[in-house]
Amino acid sequence: KNILEIDSCQIVSPHIQEVMPKLLELISKEKELEDKLFGIEFLGSTTNDLLVTLIYHRKLGEAWNILAKELESKVTIKIIGRSRKQKQIISEDLISEKLNINNKDYNFEYQEGGFTQPNTNVNIQMIEWVLNNIQDSSKDLCELYCGGGNFTIPLSTKFNKVLATEISKTSIKSARRNCELNNISNIEFIRMSAEEFVQALNKVRA
């Protein structure tokens, strides 16, 4: 259980690699930002939009808000502070992403707390593989646990209508927003578990 200290992480995106040491250096200079800081989470995109969540074991007050806002401008990131039953959003709690899939651009917004694919290149390859192996159809598509519409939105171009389910409120909100960003109107997102969907399909529940 020995702790191994590292000063860089080569498997994350170049932008996160660049921001990490700058962020840690600036945090270490301010006791209010450093005090009981438990963890840091990064949510980035290929557009270099970067959301950083600072997680604390203490309540965050106005002094923290002021310093976090200064930190945002110094590093050009978006910051959220989290502690028990507390979420402090300094500017925004989401990032913008643009994916080029089969030579077509799709716009997405990823919200903090929602599920996202961590490897953008692999994600694009997965979506393209599915699209390239499905013929255009006049039939409908049902997708379970759709997240923020990562597969749903590109796949909607292949089908008449799409019904997509998800249990996360955050993901459903993002999915509906992502439909608007891409001017897609043939998808209906509903909040429902797979078990509930099967019950509805079998007419066990309304």
PLM regions: where:
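Short, aliphatic-rich beta-strand segments
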Residues: 5, 48-57, 107-110
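A short glycine-rich, hydrophobically flanked beta-strand micro-motif that places a catalytic Asp/Glu
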Residues: 35-44
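Residue-level recognition of well-ordered beta-strand positions that form the cores
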Residues: 41, 53-55, 98
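Short strand-connecting beta-turns/loops that link adjacent beta-strands
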Residues: 45-48, 102
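Rossmann-like S-adenosyl-L-methionine
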Residues: 57-206
